[in-house]
Amino acid sequence: MVQINENYLKLKAGYLFPEISKRVNSYTQANQGSEVIKLGIGDVTEPLPNACINAMSKALNEMGTHEGFKGYGPEQGYEWLREKISKNDFISRGCQITPEEIFVSDGSKCDSSNILDILGHDNLIAVTDPVYPVYVDSNVMTGRTGETLKNGTYQGLLYLAINEDNNFLPEIPKNKVDIVYLCFPNNPTGATITKDELKKWVDYANHNKSLILFDAAYEAFIQDKDVPHSIYEIDGAKSCAIEFRSFSKNAGFTGVRCAYTVIPKCLTGQNSKGDKVDLWPLWNRRQCTKFNGVSYVVQKGAEAVYSSQGKKEVNSLIDFYMENAKIMRNKLRSAGFTVYGGCNAPYVWIKVPADMTSWDFFDHLLEKANVVGTPGSGFGLAGEGYFRLSAFNSRLNVSNAMERIINI
């Protein structure tokens, strides 16, 4: 009989968001007619920008002609899109990232997991706690951790607690780690990092020859001018960091699927003999073998994000969601909740009442207010006692949800 990958058996009972869906479905089936407002999963709700729709429609029509038809595209992405990304997202901020260092993909969730394909199994890995679950689960699936401990953590991972005491910023490890995942603006806490704090991480990584996997999926929501949008704004980052970006949240591409990963040409690892090995060719080889590229139509939609109309419409979407976050933050604070985040990220991170766990509060909001959020403990041990609410919803739903919560 075929042998399975037993690492999957180490995973917790269910991925966080399917578990939430399971509980919500159970509640709605038992309470027919309940109008549940979902502020849990960070999925967008507003329509795509017209600039993107028009560009994709034009591209689709092109595909219906012999002259305009496109088959397999380049695995790295079309050069015209990578040039726009390089110019608008990096060169404009003083980051010398070339189009050749950009790999277009169908999602940063996929890339942050798939990057492990080119990294060895013996690396010591650090993650923040709480953390986006994909970072942990993908390492478990590929056998890079030990067994599950009683507290829900995994042997072999170094957990860096982020909480009120350290302003939700992880402390630099005292010892060497090989790989560290950083996400800023942070999911789930909504916290940001300053250039000075990020420089400490870059210096640490270069000193220890470590690799930073930097998730910048929410950079477009940054409002403060002194908050870095890219790790490459920091001197020395190109020699120690890979950055993940996405069109999902800023341009509403969660159902369209387009993202990109930056791997600088100067970034290196080493083999078992201690010889330096460039990471760019390894990732390029991986993509050429396992990925057929993002469709021409979708990439044309992504290119339109950088048009003058596209920029205006994307900014309008971001302003809409950030106004939602402001409403949530202000309403919850007026009701006596301690609230973090929501200033440079589309998430608010609230402390739950002292007599409740995160899942207790989840059930409380679901049953008493018909509002769904995400229990902080689902993001890690240090998330216990907190709760995440997403600003990705309609203005009416956000306003109604806040009124329901404060009137419980």
Swiss-Prot record:
Its EC top class is transferase
Which parts of the sequence bind substrate? 15, 42, 109, 132, 187, 292, 388
Question: Residue positions of the PTM N6-(pyridoxal phosphate)lysine?
Answer: 249
Name the Gene Ontology biological process terms.
lysine biosynthetic process via diaminopimelate, diaminopimelate-aminotransferase pathway
Residues that, per the record, bind pyridoxal 5'-phosphate: 72, 108-109, 132, 187, 218, 246-248, 257, 292
Gene Ontology MF terms: L,L-diaminopimelate aminotransferase activity; pyridoxal phosphate binding
According to the UniProt entry, what is the EC number of this protein? 2.6.1.83
| Needed cofactors | pyridoxal 5'-phosphate
Supply the InterPro entries for this chain.
Aminotransferase_I/II_large, DapL/ALD1, PyrdxlP-dep_Trfase, PyrdxlP-dep_Trfase_major, PyrdxlP-dep_Trfase_small
* Family according to the record: Belongs to the class-I pyridoxal-phosphate-dependent aminotransferase family. LL-diaminopimelate aminotransferase subfamily.
User: Quaternary structure?
Assistant: Homodimer.
- Protein's job: Involved in the synthesis of meso-diaminopimelate (m-DAP or DL-DAP), required for both lysine and peptidoglycan biosynthesis. Catalyzes the direct conversion of tetrahydrodipicolinate to LL-diaminopimelate.
Q: Any idea what this protein is called? A: LL-diaminopimelate aminotransferase
Q: Which organism is it from?
A: Prochlorococcus marinus (strain MIT 9515)
Q: Which gene encodes it?
A: dapL
